[in-house]
Amino acid sequence: MPEMPEVENVRATLQELVPGKKIDQVIVRVPKMIVSTPPDEFVHMLVGQEIEGVRRRGKFLLFDLTNCTILSHLRMEGKFRLMDENEEVSKHTHIIFHFEDHTELRFLDVRKFGTMEVTNKYGEGETRSIKKLGPEPLTQAFTLTDFATGVKKTSRAIKTALLDQKLVAGVGNIYADEICFEAKVRPERAANSLSDKEIKRIFKATKSIMTEAVALGGSTVRTYVNSQGKLGQYQNKLKVYGKTDEPCVVCGTPIEKIKLNGRGTHFCPNCQK
């Protein structure tokens, strides 16, 4: 699933491509992808609207139109591509926004898990999806004090806590593993067992890793590309995720993989305590 660094890079590339484009037709080929609104109403609300800009909140893309905002979640495999109207439509293209300039923004999703919903303009904060999100890791709202308070409140594994979007928005499986490694903390440690120093290390690692991942275009470990079809580069920086049985870059101990609450989880049994 694309995490915050990947979604931010999708946002940035879309922001270069679609503002100013006016929608004259919307085709919904998989109705279940439209949530909170009947698909025909979704289409009716969008025709005639102009895209003014693209924002992001957590793992959600926010398309600001003339009179409304579209919330889009990529889930596991969702991708946006801007194409000419005459280009072949692939079988994995499920939603098409056709523009007056004869281009199309197409939403492709092999697994059909992606979702879209429409809300009042800038009204995403009132939706169930956005209302529950915690602070972004690269904003001033993400503070050590609040983070430590949240961590100390739960007996869940620290990795599980990092994946809780109410604690910090945008961290997923890849970066949670990398954060725990950088902080030298075992991912299965009970969050409320961590010392203040360990919590501070996790906080700092969250900010530094997410910052670098955004700068490098995210991680392409499966099929992720941005909206211009470019691969991420942070996968070349990963130290534990996907490195099962490879030597730790710090100590040489083989990286181990376990299941933690159903998630494949990678760590160094020597460096992380």
Curated annotation (Swiss-Prot):
What does it catalyze? Hydrolysis of DNA containing ring-opened 7-methylguanine residues, releasing 2,6-diamino-4-hydroxy-5-(N-methyl)formamidopyrimidine; 2'-deoxyribonucleotide-(2'-deoxyribose 5'-phosphate)-2'-deoxyribonucleotide-DNA = a 3'-end 2'-deoxyribonucleotide-(2,3-dehydro-2,3-deoxyribose 5'-phosphate)-DNA + a 5'-end 5'-phospho-2'-deoxyribonucleoside-DNA + H(+)
Mind listing the GO biological process terms from this record?
A: base-excision repair
Tell me the Pfam families matching this sequence: Fapy_DNA_glyco, H2TH, zf-FPG_IleRS
Q: Which residues bind DNA?
A: 92, 111
Zinc finger spans (FPG-type) are: 239-273
Mind telling me which SMART domains this protein's record contains? Fapy_DNA_glyco, H2TH
User: What does the UniProt cofactor note say?
Assistant: Binds 1 zinc ion per subunit.
> Which keywords are on file for this protein?
DNA damage, DNA repair, DNA-binding, Glycosidase, Hydrolase, Lyase, Metal-binding, Multifunctional enzyme, Zinc, Zinc-finger
**EC code:** 3.2.2.23, 4.2.99.18
The record's listing under PROSITE patterns reads: FPG_CAT, ZF_FPG_1, ZF_FPG_2
Q: Which GO terms describe its molecular function?
A: 8-oxo-7,8-dihydroguanine DNA N-glycosylase activity; class I DNA-(apurinic or apyrimidinic site) endonuclease activity; damaged DNA binding; DNA-(apurinic or apyrimidinic site) endonuclease activity; zinc ion binding
Query: Which cofactors does this gene product need?
Result: Zn(2+)
Instruction: Please name the catalytic residues of this protein.
Output: 2 (schiff-base intermediate with dna), 3 (proton donor), 59 (proton donor), 263 (proton donor)
Assembly and partners are described as: Monomer.
Q: Which family does it belong to?
A: Belongs to the FPG family.
Q: What is the role of the protein in this entry?
A: Involved in base excision repair of DNA damaged by oxidation or by mutagenic agents. Acts as a DNA glycosylase that recognizes and removes damaged bases. Has a preference for oxidized purines, such as 7,8-dihydro-8-oxoguanine (8-oxoG). Has AP (apurinic/apyrimidinic) lyase activity and introduces nicks in the DNA strand. Cleaves the DNA backbone by beta-delta elimination to generate a single-strand break at the site of the removed base with both 3'- and 5'-phosphates.
Q: What is this protein called?
A: Formamidopyrimidine-DNA glycosylase
Q: What is the lineage of its organism?
A: Bacteria, Bacillati, Bacillota, Bacilli, Bacillales
